[in-house]
UniProtKB/Swiss-Prot annotation:
Keywords: Cytoplasm, Methyltransferase, rRNA processing, S-adenosyl-L-methionine, Transferase. Specifically methylates the N4 position of cytidine in position 1402 (C1402) of 16S rRNA. InterPro entries: RsmH (IPR002903), SAM-dep_MeTrfase_MraW_recog (IPR023397), SAM-dependent_MTases_sf (IPR029063). GO terms for molecular function: rRNA (cytosine-N4-)-methyltransferase activity. Residues 315-337 are annotated as: Disordered. This is Ribosomal RNA small subunit methyltransferase H. NCBIfam families: 16S rRNA (cytosine(1402)-N(4))-methyltransferase RsmH. S-adenosyl-L-methionine binds at residues 36-38, 56, 82, 100, 107.
Length: 337
């Protein structure tokens, strides 16, 4: 098995390529190109008749893709979220799809993108800086309740109400425009503890997920991926936190396992599985963690499409799967409220 270029270390590189089982003349889609580590691995296994489609909503990632692969006739490059992959490929035409979720290392490492609480920069956090509100814009106009709900729902931040109150109070005095401003403010109102985790970690995660609609895009992308795969095609998804992994795990199980029967309801149409689980949760081993510590939280799940089964992907069902930031924060959560 080939190894990735030293300049960029993609997470679970070998496991992803093993999971996708790339064939010489297959068609594959990388929905989160990033800096192209996984895409290069797929391309190495493709012959002249193979095809690779890459997507990313980050214009910097697209620029890297065009520089790296622009002259390769096997590669087509598309700027946009993987939630819209159904507009890029027709149904049942793809042999393998990879979704590597969350924020990429280059996005974290560049202070100007505004993702990192450890590097001072403009408070942006948009994966696509040309669309939508920045984090600074959202924090400037969101209500205290909305901020608290987002911090609790997407960050599981126990001090969500206390932090939201502090943000609203501070913005009345001066706008929050820098990542260091927000990180320092959060740290100043958090209870002292022994945790090695930065006190702003959960809040930055929550705001980023909300700004980029990450979980809604994940839901839409999973449905679109299932439609796009051929029978025998494989879906590989890498998640980095429990909210993402829970959605992926439940999605794959929904189409691989019959739901529990209910004797009180009329007998349903026999369940025909659409997916077969190829693996459970795959995590980085010690050797990879020594090289790439950021892989510690990565979880890879792989499933194979079997054929046309019974699907239930209506809007009502999807709405049950996405955490709702308007759900009430339990009274036991937050500060001494």
């Amino acid at each position: 098995m080939s190894q990735p270029p030293a300049a960029h270390v993609p997470v679970l590189y070998t496991q992803v390529l093993d999971g996708l089982q790339v064939t010489e003349n297959g068609t594959y889609l990388d929905g989160t190109f990033g800096r192209g580590g996984h895409a290069r691995g797929v391309l190495e296994h493709l012959g002249p008749g193979g095809r690779l489609l890459v997507m990313d909503k980050d214009p910097e990632a697209i620029a890297v893709a065009e520089h790296s692969f622009g002259g390769d006739a096997r590669v087509s490059i598309h700027r946009g979220s993987f939630a819209g992959l159904g507009q890029v490929v027709a149904a049942a035409t793809v042999d393998g799809i990879l979704l590597d979720l969350g924020v990429s290392s280059p996005q974290l490492d560049v202070a100007g993108r505004g993702f990192s609480f450890g590097k001072d920069g403009p408070l942006d956090m948009r994966m696509d800086p040309d669309n939508g509100q920045s984090a600074a814009q959202w924090l400037a106009q969101a209500s205290e309740r909305e901020i608290a709900d987002v911090l609790w729902t997407y960050g599981e931040e126990r001090q969500s109400r206390r932090i939201a109150r502090a943000i609203v109070a501070r913005r009345a005095e001066q706008p929050l425009l820098r990542t260091a401003q927000l990180a320092d403010l959060i740290a100043s109102v958090m209870p002292r503890g022994d945790s090695k985790t930065h006190p702003a970690t959960r809040s930055f995660q929550a705001i980023r997920i909300h700004i980029n609609r990450e979980l809604a895009d994940l839901e839409a992308g999973l449905d679109a991926a299932l439609d796009a795969l051929k029978p025998g095609g494989r879906l590989a998804v890498i998640s980095f936190h429990s909210l993402e992994d829970r959605i992926v795990k439940q999605f794959m199980a929904r189409y691989a396992k019959a739901p529990p029967s209910n004797r009180r309801l009329p007998e349903a149409q026999p369940f025909v599985p659409t997916l077969q689980l190829v693996s459970g949760a795959i995590k980085a081993d010690d050797a990879e963690l020594n090289v790439n510590p950021r892989a510690r939280s990565a979880v890879l799940r792989v499933a194979e499409k079997l054929g046309v089964g019974i699907r239930n992907s209506g809007l009502e069902e999807r709405s049950k799967r996405i955490p709702n930031p308007q759900s009430p924060i339990p009274a036991s959560q937050g500060d001494a409220q």
